[in-house]
């Protein structure tokens, strides 16, 4: 999928292997960036860490002054490869644990889990994460895409464009909405509280995050796929608490407001 987005076409076997090799060879961060991440406030939001890390990558990149299409393709791949490493490193530091360096023998999704937790989880969980990354990878002309294109329209550099896009993506009316949904789930705590909570929220005219879309009036097209994997992970973990909360809230929102997730 990453190859498709960058090259506008699917790779053959040889092209895919070359692309995967390049991605794996560029996962490691500089000593300088690791040190910067170590000194970031532990309360920092991960999206702010990603934004800052990409900006530093731009300062360090050997082709930072070259904005040719060919150089931008190479820089895009390096940003793609290094960003998970930066986020995982910050996660470990925030937890008071030693940084785990990337492994070249793991897939993109597997490697992120490994760098965060020191092990790769069950294949079903890796698959669910992979599917989520694919669904988020490209989503038409949204706010963060618009932001990146606005920045590049002045012929600014790719790292600056991605830094701006990440800042835009963080917002609760864009990519940050899923974080707000998780906060909502944690407030509800258990399925027995869900019906009362959602009814009170509607009665008090509160915003219920995760519902309603400026484009998808009958529901986000990504939801059915993620709902499927949500259920698979819940079953695997033998914990359907959040799945049950979701189903109750969704049912009430559709019935009372005709608003879909």
Language-model segment annotations:
Residues 1-261:
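Hydrophobic alpha-helical bundle cores within soluble ligand-binding/oligomerization subdomains
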